[in-house]
Amino acid sequence: MNGTDAEPMLDTEPVLRTDYLGLHLKSPLVAAASALGESLDNILRLEDAGAAAIVLPSIFEEQILLENAALENDLTRGTESFAESLDYFPGTPSLHHEMEHYLNLIRAAKNRCEIPILASLNGATPGGWVSFAQQIEQAGADALELNTYALATGFLKTSAIIEDGLVDLVHRVRQSVQLRLAVKLSPYFTSIPHLARQMDDAGADALVLFNRFYQPDFDIENLAVVPKLTLSRPEELLLRLHWVAILYGHLRAELAVTGGVHGVEDVLKSIMAGAQVVQLASALLRHGVGHIDTLHSGLLRWMREHEYASIRQMRGSLSRRSAPDPSAFERGNYIRTLSSYTLRYKNLQQY
């Protein structure tokens, strides 16, 4: 039996309970932000299927701004001729339909569900992050995930400017709400440990690794750039495991894995690397929400077979901090891996 925290064996069912963002969860299986959480009916289906918590789809500040701009255009079209018509319409600030729909979804989910409901926010301006975070808190969300999905396309914006901006927004939101905050990061930073420590210091309660950028494809026949969405693959998990294992034990913030978690082994590897929870999206879109129960049953079966009494017992057992050979996470292992692959290739040439 392996593990960093020795526990006496229990003659009972293995314990899947875990804590995340100050919430007591029945298991580490969390439904990630996706289209599955866009309606109350689907949210209830996810709860019935065994999700320990649900992250609602991200509300994007651009959605609200674009809607308001279109509404403003509709309300003012022709008013240079009929100025009195403005008296019949309320001002646009009260007509945030997208935001109000999102807040109503939070309220409805909290009213009907027994499991925690986490909101997800992707802002475009510092003021937008703060304002929307405050409204989300007032609506009753149990926690808030800051989805820092931003592409650096400007040639004058340095990596330091981008990272300082992200840290500043976390600090601003932290100062404005009492909600527990998770920050969803991308893997494309020069020094992930340094940024993680800065996020930790700024008040992030958890880091979610990693965001997936949805990259457009090229249509060579019509000379067009077209949107393309692909589900994650299990091999994408390796990058997440690597960084969670490195960060585990060095931050106050908790760690969550999202992207590439499809099977029971993926869940186990994530926890052994140091994650508190895993977030599931592509696996549920591919296999259906009933896949949560498949993973739940598989976890219990594996833990019984390997004599683990609880999830906590295995957490971090494969982290860099617990590894007898830390070089497995560093350059030395890269060299050994290449050498091993070269040797196998030479052996194949003999046939």
Task: Report residues per predicted region.
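Residue-level signal for pocket-adjacent positions within structured domains
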Residues: D11-Y20, I59, V226, L280
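Alpha/beta enzyme core
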Residues: L40-E61, L65-E80, H97-L118, N122-V257, ...
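Alpha/beta catalytic cores of nucleotide-metabolism and tRNA/nucleoside-modifying enzymes
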Residues: M1-L10, S232-R252, V264-Y351
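Short, basic, glycine/proline-bearing loop/turn elements
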Residues: L23-A32, Y88-T92, R180-A182
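N-terminal amphipathic alpha-helix/helix-capping segment at the start of soluble metabolic enzymes
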Residues: N2-V30, Y102-K110
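Glycine-rich phosphate/pyrophosphate-binding beta-alpha loops
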Residues: A33-G37
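Short glycine/proline- and acidic residue-enriched helix-loop micro-motifs
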Residues: E84-P93, T230
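Short glycine- and Lys/Arg-enriched binding-loop motifs that mark or flank ligand-binding interfaces
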Residues: T18, V30, I115, A253-A256, ...
